Protein backbone atom coordinates (compact mmCIF):
# COMPACT_ATOMS: atom_id res chain seq x y z
CA UNK A 1 0.00 0.00 0.00
CA UNK A 2 2.99 2.32 0.48
CA UNK A 3 3.56 2.43 -3.28
CA UNK A 4 -0.05 3.36 -3.90
CA UNK A 5 0.20 6.16 -1.36
CA UNK A 6 2.95 7.88 -3.38
CA UNK A 7 0.91 8.12 -6.55
CA UNK A 8 -2.65 8.46 -5.30
CA UNK A 9 -3.78 10.33 -2.19
CA UNK A 10 -5.65 8.12 0.24
CA UNK A 11 -8.19 9.08 2.87
CA UNK A 12 -8.57 6.76 5.87
CA UNK A 13 -11.86 8.19 7.09
CA UNK A 14 -14.20 11.14 7.01
CA UNK A 15 -16.02 11.97 10.23
CA UNK A 16 -18.90 14.31 10.91
CA UNK A 17 -19.47 14.54 14.66
CA UNK A 18 -21.73 16.73 16.76
CA UNK A 19 -20.56 19.17 19.45
CA UNK A 20 -20.49 16.33 22.00
CA UNK A 21 -18.36 14.05 19.83
CA UNK A 22 -21.22 11.76 18.82
CA UNK A 23 -21.59 10.43 15.27
CA UNK A 24 -23.67 12.25 12.72
CA UNK A 25 -22.13 10.65 9.61
CA UNK A 26 -18.90 8.67 9.36
CA UNK A 27 -17.24 6.70 6.60
CA UNK A 28 -14.13 4.54 7.02
CA UNK A 29 -11.96 3.55 4.06
CA UNK A 30 -9.15 1.85 5.99
CA UNK A 31 -8.86 -1.35 8.00
CA UNK A 32 -6.85 0.49 10.68
CA UNK A 33 -9.98 0.37 12.83
CA UNK A 34 -11.33 -3.14 12.35
CA UNK A 35 -14.11 -3.12 14.95
CA UNK A 36 -16.90 -0.70 15.69
CA UNK A 37 -15.48 -0.28 19.20
CA UNK A 38 -12.09 0.79 17.79
CA UNK A 39 -13.82 3.23 15.44
CA UNK A 40 -15.81 4.77 18.29
CA UNK A 41 -12.65 4.97 20.42
CA UNK A 42 -10.80 6.76 17.61
CA UNK A 43 -13.68 9.21 17.15
CA UNK A 44 -13.74 9.93 20.88
CA UNK A 45 -9.95 10.40 20.92
CA UNK A 46 -9.95 12.74 17.92
CA UNK A 47 -12.81 14.76 19.38
CA UNK A 48 -11.18 15.04 22.81
CA UNK A 49 -7.89 16.23 21.27
CA UNK A 50 -9.46 18.81 18.97
CA UNK A 51 -12.62 20.07 20.66
CA UNK A 52 -10.85 22.84 22.59
CA UNK A 53 -9.26 24.33 19.48
CA UNK A 54 -10.71 27.18 17.48
CA UNK A 55 -11.16 25.67 14.01
CA UNK A 56 -14.20 27.72 13.06
CA UNK A 57 -12.73 30.06 10.47
CA UNK A 58 -10.04 27.90 8.89
CA UNK A 59 -9.15 24.23 8.90
CA UNK A 60 -6.62 23.02 11.46
CA UNK A 61 -4.16 20.14 11.09
CA UNK A 62 -2.85 17.79 13.77
CA UNK A 63 -0.99 14.48 14.02
CA UNK A 64 -2.80 11.86 16.14
CA UNK A 65 -1.90 8.17 16.45
CA UNK A 66 0.37 8.36 13.37
CA UNK A 67 -2.46 9.89 11.33
CA UNK A 68 -2.82 13.37 9.93
CA UNK A 69 -6.21 14.79 10.88
CA UNK A 70 -7.55 17.98 9.30
CA UNK A 71 -10.65 19.44 10.84
CA UNK A 72 -13.06 22.34 10.86
CA UNK A 73 -16.02 23.25 13.04
CA UNK A 74 -19.30 24.91 12.08
CA UNK A 75 -22.16 25.59 14.49
CA UNK A 76 -22.63 22.30 16.36
CA UNK A 77 -20.89 20.11 13.75
CA UNK A 78 -17.25 19.01 13.63
CA UNK A 79 -15.82 17.89 10.26
CA UNK A 80 -12.72 15.64 10.18
CA UNK A 81 -10.67 14.02 7.40
CA UNK A 82 -7.94 11.52 8.33
CA UNK A 83 -5.00 10.35 6.25
CA UNK A 84 -1.75 8.49 6.90
CA UNK A 85 1.20 10.28 8.48
CA UNK A 86 2.90 10.56 5.06
CA UNK A 87 -0.17 11.88 3.28
CA UNK A 88 -0.19 15.34 1.73
CA UNK A 89 -1.88 17.76 4.14
CA UNK A 90 -3.03 19.99 1.30
CA UNK A 91 -4.90 17.12 -0.35
CA UNK A 92 -6.59 16.21 2.94
CA UNK A 93 -7.43 19.87 3.50
CA UNK A 94 -8.96 20.05 -0.01
CA UNK A 95 -11.11 17.01 0.76
CA UNK A 96 -12.23 18.60 4.03
CA UNK A 97 -13.04 21.93 2.39
CA UNK A 98 -14.87 20.23 -0.48
CA UNK A 99 -16.97 18.19 1.95
CA UNK A 100 -17.69 21.20 4.16
CA UNK A 101 -18.64 23.46 1.23
CA UNK A 102 -20.76 20.78 -0.49
CA UNK A 103 -22.68 20.17 2.73
CA UNK A 104 -23.14 23.94 3.15
CA UNK A 105 -24.48 24.20 -0.41
CA UNK A 106 -26.87 21.29 0.00
CA UNK A 107 -28.09 22.49 3.41
CA UNK A 108 -28.43 26.04 2.08
CA UNK A 109 -25.75 27.35 4.46
CA UNK A 110 -27.70 26.01 7.45
CA UNK A 111 -24.83 23.78 8.61
CA UNK A 112 -26.11 22.47 11.93
CA UNK A 113 -26.80 19.07 13.44
CA UNK A 114 -30.59 19.02 13.09
CA UNK A 115 -30.48 20.03 9.43
CA UNK A 116 -27.69 17.49 8.79
CA UNK A 117 -29.71 14.69 10.38
CA UNK A 118 -32.77 15.59 8.31
CA UNK A 119 -30.63 15.43 5.15
CA UNK A 120 -28.35 12.53 6.08
CA UNK A 121 -28.90 10.90 2.69
CA UNK A 122 -27.41 13.95 0.96
CA UNK A 123 -24.40 13.92 3.28
CA UNK A 124 -23.67 10.26 2.56
CA UNK A 125 -24.09 10.91 -1.17
CA UNK A 126 -21.50 13.70 -0.80
CA UNK A 127 -19.09 11.24 0.79
CA UNK A 128 -19.70 8.74 -2.01
CA UNK A 129 -19.06 11.37 -4.69
CA UNK A 130 -15.85 12.56 -3.01
CA UNK A 131 -14.00 9.39 -2.00
CA UNK A 132 -14.17 5.78 -3.19
CA UNK A 133 -12.27 3.12 -1.22
CA UNK A 134 -10.03 5.86 0.16
CA UNK A 135 -9.15 7.37 -3.23
CA UNK A 136 -10.07 11.01 -3.73
CA UNK A 137 -12.44 11.41 -6.68
CA UNK A 138 -13.61 15.02 -6.37
CA UNK A 139 -13.01 18.03 -4.12
CA UNK A 140 -14.94 20.76 -5.95
CA UNK A 141 -17.99 21.50 -3.80
CA UNK A 142 -20.06 22.76 -6.74
CA UNK A 143 -19.48 19.56 -8.72
CA UNK A 144 -20.19 17.38 -5.67
CA UNK A 145 -23.37 19.26 -4.75
CA UNK A 146 -24.56 19.17 -8.37
CA UNK A 147 -24.07 15.40 -8.65
CA UNK A 148 -25.74 14.81 -5.28
CA UNK A 149 -28.68 17.02 -6.23
CA UNK A 150 -29.10 15.11 -9.50
CA UNK A 151 -28.94 11.72 -7.75
CA UNK A 152 -31.38 12.92 -5.15
CA UNK A 153 -33.74 14.19 -7.85
CA UNK A 154 -33.57 10.91 -9.76
CA UNK A 155 -34.32 8.95 -6.60
CA UNK A 156 -37.33 10.96 -5.50
CA UNK A 157 -38.80 12.06 -8.83
CA UNK A 158 -40.68 15.27 -9.52
CA UNK A 159 -40.91 16.42 -5.90
CA UNK A 160 -37.16 16.97 -5.90
CA UNK A 161 -37.09 19.00 -9.10
CA UNK A 162 -37.58 22.14 -7.09
CA UNK A 163 -34.86 21.07 -4.64
CA UNK A 164 -32.52 20.37 -7.57
CA UNK A 165 -33.19 23.80 -9.00
CA UNK A 166 -32.57 25.39 -5.61
CA UNK A 167 -29.35 23.42 -5.09
CA UNK A 168 -28.05 24.35 -8.53
CA UNK A 169 -28.98 27.99 -7.98
CA UNK A 170 -27.16 27.96 -4.66
CA UNK A 171 -24.15 26.26 -6.30
CA UNK A 172 -24.18 28.89 -9.07
CA UNK A 173 -24.35 31.66 -6.45
CA UNK A 174 -21.46 30.10 -4.51
CA UNK A 175 -19.37 29.83 -7.69
CA UNK A 176 -20.09 33.45 -8.59
CA UNK A 177 -19.09 34.54 -5.07
CA UNK A 178 -15.85 32.57 -5.25
CA UNK A 179 -15.00 34.08 -8.65
CA UNK A 180 -15.54 37.60 -7.33
CA UNK A 181 -13.22 37.16 -4.34
From Swiss-Prot:
GO terms for biological process: protein transport; retrograde vesicle-mediated transport, Golgi to endoplasmic reticulum. The keyword DNA repair does not apply. GO terms for cellular component: COPI vesicle coat; cytosol; Golgi membrane; plasma membrane. It comes from the Eukaryota. It is found in: Cytoplasm; Golgi apparatus membrane; Cytoplasmic vesicle, COPI-coated vesicle membrane. It is a peripheral membrane protein. Pfam families: Clat_adaptor_s. SUPFAM superfamilies: SNARE-like. Keywords: Cytoplasm, Cytoplasmic vesicle, ER-Golgi transport, Golgi apparatus, Membrane, Protein transport, Transport. PANTHER family: COATOMER SUBUNIT ZETA-3 (PTHR11043:SF28), ZETA-COAT PROTEIN (PTHR11043). Oligomeric complex that consists of at least the alpha, beta, beta', gamma, delta, epsilon and zeta subunits. Belongs to the adaptor complexes small subunit family. The coatomer is a cytosolic protein complex that binds to dilysine motifs and reversibly associates with Golgi non-clathrin-coated vesicles, which further mediate biosynthetic protein transport from the ER, via the Golgi up to the trans Golgi network. Coatomer complex is required for budding from Golgi membranes, and is essential for the retrograde Golgi-to-ER transport of dilysine-tagged proteins. The zeta subunit may be involved in regulating the coat assembly and, hence, the rate of biosynthetic protein transport due to its association-dissociation properties with the coatomer complex. This is Coatomer subunit zeta-3. It comes from Arabidopsis thaliana. The lineage of its organism: Eukaryota, Viridiplantae, Streptophyta, Embryophyta, Tracheophyta.
